[in-house]
């Protein structure tokens, strides 16, 4: 489409008008290159080898798939090439310093939804870009122990029927689609806006017996539909791939819930704050949606370590608010989590790219 916004054009304009974001733009451009390679591997399926083969054990004890290792290597190479200062990955036990004069730190989940590799369901790459905060002799984890409000940019690539990028630089959320002919990422539509109301929710309902009371009560109300207190019917959507559910919510609304529960290893939630919850929350808030752990806005949580877990609820603001109210009724107060999306960087025409 001749009138579609090209990602490279968008990044050039942001970098020229807001030099403080130049390093972040370089990272996104480099990650787009890695995403093209990952998309090509996935498109070939078994012709690329047994990408779903278990080749080892991940940090959390799950089986590490072949594609987990491949995507980690590709993304790491891209981040190094971008000139970033530090790199952290779900597939690495500890972060690492890269470039001593780099300006940003990049945290990634190289392959979200790896259980879907062999099923043609969507998988993705999630990233968060933070100020590097150099300090002599500092622990390479230090740049990543900032709240999500400090993110300079964030996004995810999703590999499904098509490859797409959802990205924000703090002034709205844009969705770019990879053109397989030209190799360019193009944005043919306006910035994403998540409707406040919805009738769709995403949660793994098989774990109902393990949930905290506020989540259980909220989901029971939805399941009662028009016969319950809500008076309307809801539909369940669950892809076992957070990027897939997030992409759908950015397009038409909905609420996603991955709460803490009573199972061993799930007491503090399952998703990682730094490189999963924070970037998704940033994207959602910049599209007019909300994200919380049930009590506190995700972007206000202070990480204590790089692989810290947290509960995560995000999506249409009206429904996220209801979850917070459920915690309040249960005597587990939540903090204010609904604020207008920030346009604090929109001092130039950059705002028009995302508005």
UniProtKB/Swiss-Prot annotation:
GO terms for cellular component: cytosol. Keywords: Carbohydrate metabolism, Cytoplasm, Hydrolase, Magnesium, Metal-binding. Pfam families: FBPase, FBPase_C. It is found in: Cytoplasm. Its cofactor is Mg(2+). It catalyses: beta-D-fructose 1,6-bisphosphate + H2O = beta-D-fructose 6-phosphate + phosphate. Substrate binds at residues 112-115, 204, 256-258. Pathway: Carbohydrate biosynthesis; gluconeogenesis. GO terms for biological process: fructose 1,6-bisphosphate metabolic process; fructose 6-phosphate metabolic process; fructose metabolic process; gluconeogenesis; sucrose biosynthetic process. Mg(2+) 2 binds at residues 109, 112, 276. This is Fructose-1,6-bisphosphatase class 1. It comes from Acidiphilium cryptum (strain JF-5).
